Amino acid sequence: MSFSITLPDGSKKDFEESLTIADLAQNIATSLGKAAVAGKVNGELKPLDYKLDSDSEVAIITNKDEEGLDVLRATAAFVFEAVAKCEYPELRLGEHVADEGGFYVDTDKDDQIKVGELPKLEKAMQKVIKNGEKIEHVQIAKSELEELYKNDKFKSELLAKVEGDTVDAYKLGDFVDFGFDALLPNTGKIKQFKLLSVAGAYWLGKSSNPMLQRIFGTAFFKEADLKADLKRRQEIKERDHRTIGRDLDLFFVDPKVGAGLPYWMPKGATIRRAVERYIIDREVADGYQHVYTPVLMNLDAYKTSGHWAHYRDDMFPPMDMGDGEMLELRPMNCPSHIQIFKHHIRSYRDLPLRVAELGMMHRYEKSGALSGLQRVREMTLNDGHTFVALDQVQTEFAKILKLIMEVYKDFDITDYYFRLSYRDPKNTDKYFANDEMWEKSQKMLKGAMDDLGLDYVEAEGEAAFYGPKLDIQTKTALGNDETMSTIQLDFMLPDRFGLTYVGKDGEEHRPVMIHRGIVGTMERFIAYLTEIYKGAFPTWLAPVQAEIIPVNNEAHGEYAEKVRAELAKRGFRVEVDDRNEKMGYKIRESQTQKVPYTLVLGDEEMKSGKVNLRRYGTDEEISKSLDDFINEIDADVKSYSREN
C-alpha cells in the first residue's frame, strides 16, 4: 500500500503504511507533534487518532489555531457532560456546541441545575482534568446507544438523525456521548476553563419544544487568555443595556404581560423623548414634513406592496373585522407614507417631497429571539421616505447621508463603515425584475458615495427586493456588527401603487422613492447608546441632569428648592434628594445613578448663593456661584446638541 499526504504548503509525503494524524504531526516535526490537537483531512475536522491510509490533503491543527480552541472547548463540554451525569444520574443531555464564544451544553432534569451549583461541578471537572484521564474515540453500534439512551428523549432524538449502523463516539470512563468532530485524547490537555452561567433554551431552538437549562462555559490553552476573556465578559456584562436598564430603572419587560413589549419607566422615557425631539427637530430643519399615520392598515395594502408575500412570517395575523375588511398591524411604514403622497395631486414643484414619522410598528418575533430593547415585538422606527424625480436621486441621497453623518457626530458615533448592497446577479429571480433599473440605481448609489469621497465595501445579494441600498454598519459596545442606518432606492413601490407627479412637460411621471432610517428604531438605538455610554449618558440625554442634596433638610431645604426651581425654569432636568438618609449615602447614590452633576448645599452655599459641585466620575469638589453653574451646564448641554 502506497499513498501520499499533501500538506497545506503543497508539499507531499509518501507512506507505505497507514498512520494516525498524531503520527503524521510527529513525522513532520517533534514540536508539531507536541502542539497538535487535531487534523483536517480533505477539509473535515478529525481527531488525532484518525487513521490515514489513502491519498489525502491534511492540515495539522495546533493549540495556536482557532479550530484548536474549538477542539479544546468541545473536550471541556464533553468532560462537563461526564461530570454532570455522574453528579446527577437522572440528568438528560441535549445539544452541545463549541465555537469562538466558548461552549454550552443543554441539560434537563426535574430540578434544573442552578448557577450556584457551577462551582461544585467545576471542582469535579478539575479533579478529572488533574488525573489526566483517557478519552477514547470509539465506534459503537447504534443499537447499543439506543438502549443506553432509551430513557433520554433528547439524546434519542439526536441519535435517530445519525445515519448508519455504527456511531462515532467518545468515552470517558463509563460515560459515552456522540456528535463531536474531534476531542483531545485525554483530559489533562484541558489547561484553563471556566463554567460561566446558566440560561433557559428551547430544545432545538423551537418555542413549541420544552425549555431546557443551557450551561455556558469557555476554555483556553493559556491562563492569560482565560483571564483576558473573563475580563472582557465582565465588561460586556457591565455594559449590557438590560442590566443597566434595570439598575437605572429605565425600562422593563414582563413576559406575563407580554414578551418583547417593553415598558418605559420615567427615566427611560425621558432619554427616549430627548432623542425623539432631537431627531424630529433635525429632520424638520432638513425639510421633512412630520406626520402621524395609523398602526393598522387594510391587508390589501401589504398585498399590493409585496410585504404580505415577502414578510408574512414576520407579521402578526390579520384581524377579520367581520364585514370583509381585514386589518393588519403594520410591520413597516412605507405603505402609510405612500398614502400621504397619493392624497394630493403632485407636481414636479413638490419634489423632493420628504415625509418622516416616528412610526410604531409590530413584528412577529419568536420568543427565543427577543432580547431587552434590541429585539422586540413593538417598536418605533425613525422612518422617512423621500419622493424624487429620477434626476434628483443622487443629490437627495447625498443630502440624506450628510444628515446621518451630522447626527452621528452629535451622538459621538465613530466606529462604523459603509456597505453598498446590490442584488445577486446570479440569482435575480428574488428581485424586482428590471435589469435597466438595477444597473441605473446601483450606479447612482455608487456615484453618490464616490462624489462624497467615502470608502465603502460592496456586497452582492444584500439588496432589498425592490432596490439597492446603503447600509451603515456600526460596532456596538459589546462588539457586535449592527446596521444603524439605511438608505434604499425603490422603483418598485411607486409602480405598484401607481404614484405619479405632473412634470414640467405637463405629463405624468413616476417618482422614485427613497427609504431611509437615520438611527433605526428607538428601542434598538437607546439600547446601543446605553451600552456605548455604559449608562453614563451625556448631560443633554441624561434623565436627571443635576441632583441637589441639602446637607440638612430643615436648614437647607428651602435653598435647595430655590436652586431647583431656577434650574428647572431654564429647562434643565433636576431633582432634590430630601430623603432622611446620610449625606454620604446620597452622594454615592447620585454617582451610582450616573447623574452628571451633584450639587451639595449647606450653610456656606446658602449664605453665599453658591453651589458645591461634583461631576460624575470625579471626587473633586468645586464651589461656584449659581449663575456660573447655570452657564456651565448650559454649555455642557449645548456641546452635545445639533448646533455643534
Swiss-Prot record:
The keyword Manganese does not apply. InterPro entries: aa-tRNA-synt_IIb, aa-tRNA-synth_II, aa-tRNA-synth_II/BPL/LPL, Anticodon-bd, Anticodon-bd_dom_sf, Beta-grasp_dom_sf, TGS, TGS-like. It is an enzyme of class 6 (ligase). It comes from the Bacteria. Zn(2+) binds at C334, H385, H515. Signal peptide: none annotated. Its EC number is 6.1.1.3. Keywords: Aminoacyl-tRNA synthetase, ATP-binding, Cytoplasm, Ligase, Metal-binding, Nucleotide-binding, Protein biosynthesis, RNA-binding, tRNA-binding, Zinc. It catalyses: tRNA(Thr) + L-threonine + ATP = L-threonyl-tRNA(Thr) + AMP + diphosphate + H(+). Catalyzes the attachment of threonine to tRNA(Thr) in a two-step reaction: L-threonine is first activated by ATP to form Thr-AMP and then transferred to the acceptor end of tRNA(Thr). Also edits incorrectly charged L-seryl-tRNA(Thr). Belongs to the class-II aminoacyl-tRNA synthetase family. This is Threonine--tRNA ligase.
